[in-house]
Amino acid sequence: MKKHSHITGFYVETLMMIVVFLLIILLLTQVFGLAQMQSTKAKRLNGAVVLAQNAAEAVAASETAEDLLALLNENDNAFPMTDTAGVTACYDSELNPDAGGTYRLDVTWLPEKTENGTMVHSMAEVRCDDAEAPVYRLETERFRMEVGT
């Protein structure tokens, strides 16, 4: 009888150990799943920041909205915005110009004449996978002094 209780104890301990290992495996699976999700979000945000910074530099280098379109257009990935002055450009997941890409960059171009020159207000919004809310938004302004004033 004593041998039987030792074997039963062994089975109970083994069963408890298996349950503990299964719980640990489930917990680690959830942790790694959440880490993968956070990594994907971080990659999207990083890509959006790069695209918005590039757009801000293009705004600074442009005299007109047409110049901005010429700077952002590669492989026919950019086109003028229909509802306001500005440019929409599309990029793939590796940030290469692609008309059907996952990233959409909308850059507004709102010039305002002042007594000394022109102030251009611009907003670069990056959306991913046709989402309504932008992943990243960057406001920028540039001033061009009029020659002879």
In which residue ranges do the predicted regions lie?
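Positively charged n-region of N-terminal signal peptides that target proteins for export
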Residues: M1-S5
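Hydrophobic membrane-insertion alpha-helices, especially the h-region
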Residues: M17-L28
